Swiss-Prot record:
Protein name per Swiss-Prot or TrEMBL: Cytochrome b
Location relative to the cell: Mitochondrion inner membrane
Binding site for a ubiquinone: H201
Manner of cofactor binding, per the entry note: Binds 2 heme b groups non-covalently.
UniProt cross-references to PROSITE patterns, sorted A to Z: CYTB_CTER, CYTB_NTER
Cited function: Component of the ubiquinol-cytochrome c reductase complex (complex III or cytochrome b-c1 complex) that is part of the mitochondrial respiratory chain. The b-c1 complex mediates electron transfer from ubiquinol to cytochrome c. Contributes to the generation of a proton gradient across the mitochondrial membrane that is then used for ATP synthesis.
GO cellular component: mitochondrial inner membrane; respiratory chain complex III
Gene name of the record: MT-CYB
Cofactor: heme b
Length: 379
């Protein structure tokens, strides 16, 4: 008799995706982040759902409703901080997942990669709108500054911004629609994740060597389920330490002051996971140029498969490319630091140099280095 998991119409989809899925025998812990991202998404949807039951998306009561959740709702404080710090864990896993793809050449699966880039944009949009909801000072001014960037678009810019705001400034209409979209987007993201997995399972997983592993596959369960559970336990440990010991470490103190359109905070800055892009935006003195650079800092991921000039897929056996990769990582960390600093000397020039280096490494230095490596290997 056939096992029910292989014959039942629903169970066989689960079986072919998570149980009997053939996986390369040599994938390392860098391949854990996909499953961790799935768990992060589930956690964010669950905690967000319970928070939405108590939150009110009205400018008069939004700030107080968040306070009410933390003080009066049973375990509301842990829901709120799991959701806020869960977003940070989400982005840590996202950036490590993208970094893994860059290092091991996973971007050569272009459909999977491009859906992944769209997912990154969707998650960033969701996180930005979520940051506006507590209606603190940084929520209000962050929303004002970032949405205002669209006014740099020629001809339609100003009308577009007012259309998004639902008025002539960030106000009640803006908060209500941001809450609606913040609630809706994670479900769209869930559907996109399924498409991401669909494309991934068409080709099978890449592996650290970058060499096809069709001749040496093992079932996903129990080997990688156990491995994923270990990664999950480590992530949950870090998340709970954050939530229970220093829940506000990654937040901004200004967000504990209710939004006041008449009082601008001295340093307007987004959450830490957007600081690298914010630094690139600020490094260009021209408004439209800054917006273009901001979008390109993420959109550049789409053209990476076309910039791959190496005869090898992975960087495992390419020491020169490895040096450039880690220089890029250091550069992005520098940009993250600069994004949180005031706009004054020497931070301005450091930000500009780091921004130039960021684009130079990806567009010029990496393809050239790959060609040099091909030549050295006489390929």
């Amino acid at each position: 008799m056939t096992n029910i998991r292989k014959s039942h119409p629903l169970l066989k989809i689960v079986n072919s995706s998570f149980i009997d899925l053939p996986a390369p025998s040599n994938i390392s812990s860098w391949w854990n982040f996909g499953s961790l991202l799935g768990i992060c998404l589930a956690l964010q949807i669950l905690t967000g759902l319970f928070l939405a039951m108590h939150y009110t998306s009205d400018t008069a009561t939004a700030f107080n409703s968040v306070t009410h959740i933390c003080r009066d709702v049973n375990y509301g404080w842990i829901l709120r901080y799991l959701h806020a710090n869960g977003a940070s864990m989400f982005f840590i896993c996202l950036y490590l997942h993208v970094g893994r793809g860059l290092y091991y050449g996973s971007y050569m699966y272009t459909e999977t990669w491009n859906v992944g880039v769209l997912l990154l944009f969707a998650v960033m949009a969701t996180a930005f709108m979520g940051y506006v909801l507590p209606w603190g000072q940084m929520s209000f001014w962050g929303a004002t500054v970032i949405t205002n960037l669209l006014s740099a678009i020629p001809y339609i810019g100003t009308s577009l911004v007012e259309w998004i705001w639902g008025g002539f400034s960030v106000d009640k209409a803006t908060l209500t629609r941001f809450f609606a979209f913040h609630f809706l987007l994670p479900f769209i993201i869930s559907a996109m994740v399924m498409v991401h997995l669909l494309f991934l399972h068409e080709t099978g997983s890449n592996n650290p060597t970058g060499i096809p592993s069709n001749m040496d596959m093992i079932p996903f369960h129990p080997y990688y389920t156990i491995k994923d559970i270990l990664g999950l336990l480590l992530m949950i440990t870090v998340l709970l330490m954050l939530v229970l010991f220093s829940p506000d470490m990654l937040g901004d103190p200004d967000n504990y002051t209710p939004a006041n359109p008449l009082n601008t905070p001295p340093h307007i800055k987004p959450e830490w996971y957007f600081l690298f892009a914010y630094a690139i935006l600020r490094s260009i003195p021209n408004k439209l140029g800054g917006v273009v650079a901001l979008v390109l800092s993420i959109l550049i991921l789409v053209i990476i498969p076309f910039l791959h000039t190496s005869k090898q897929r992975s960087m495992t056996f390419r020491p020169l490319s490895q040096c450039l990769f880690w220089l890029l990582v250091a550069d992005l960390l520098t940009l993250t630091w600069i994004g949180g600093q005031p706009v004054e000397h020497p931070y301005i020039i450091i930000g500009q140099l780091a921004s130039i280096l960021n684009f130079s490494i990806i567009i010029i230095l990496m393809p050239l280095t790959s060609l040099v490596e091909n030549h050295l290997l006489k390929w």
